[in-house]
Every structure is written in C-alpha cells, then in structure tokens.
Amino acid sequence: MAKKLEITLTRSLIGRPQDQRVTVNTLGLRKMHQTVVQEDNAAIRGMVNKVSHLVTVKEIEA
C-alpha cells in the first residue's frame, strides 16, 4: 500500500514570512489544527521540511 502523510497545522502563521505562508497554503492547510492527508513523495516532504516548525506529521498506511 502507498504511504500517506497526515499533516496538521499546530502553530500560527501570524508574523511568519510570506514564503512559509504560501508553503502551508500549498499543503492545503488554512486554519489552526486543520489536518490534511497528502501523498508521501519528495515534493510534499520538501514542503513539510520547510515548515516543520509549524506542523506535525504522522505517516499512515492508506
């Protein structure tokens, strides 16, 4: 089965640079404590690494 990532926005975007805000929005996160499920690939991993201080990530089997 393909692995997926469960990504939750845990820190606020207030006062964050524009590139971090865009990255979080590109991941599909709009509000605090919102969770999205994304495919586990290099592009998503790169975005998560860029904003790792703002999100929590869990690997799930889907």
Swiss-Prot record:
CDD domains attached to this UniProt entry: Ribosomal_L30
GO BP, one annotated term: translation
Spans traversing the lipid bilayer: none
Molecular function as annotated in GO: structural constituent of ribosome
Gene3D superfamilies: Ribosomal protein L30, ferredoxin-like fold domain
Pfam families from the UniProt entry: Ribosomal_L30
PROSITE patterns documented for this protein: RIBOSOMAL_L30
GO cellular component, one term: cytosolic large ribosomal subunit
InterPro entries membership: Ribo_uL30_ferredoxin-like_sf, Ribosomal_uL30_bac-type, Ribosomal_uL30_CS, Ribosomal_uL30_ferredoxin-like
UniProt keyword terms in alphabetical order: Ribonucleoprotein, Ribosomal protein
Family membership: Belongs to the universal ribosomal protein uL30 family.
HAMAP family according to UniProt: Ribosomal_uL30_B
Quaternary structure and partners: Part of the 50S ribosomal subunit.
Record protein name field: Large ribosomal subunit protein uL30
Taxon lineage: Bacteria, Bacillati, Bacillota, Bacilli, Bacillales
Annotated gene: rpmD
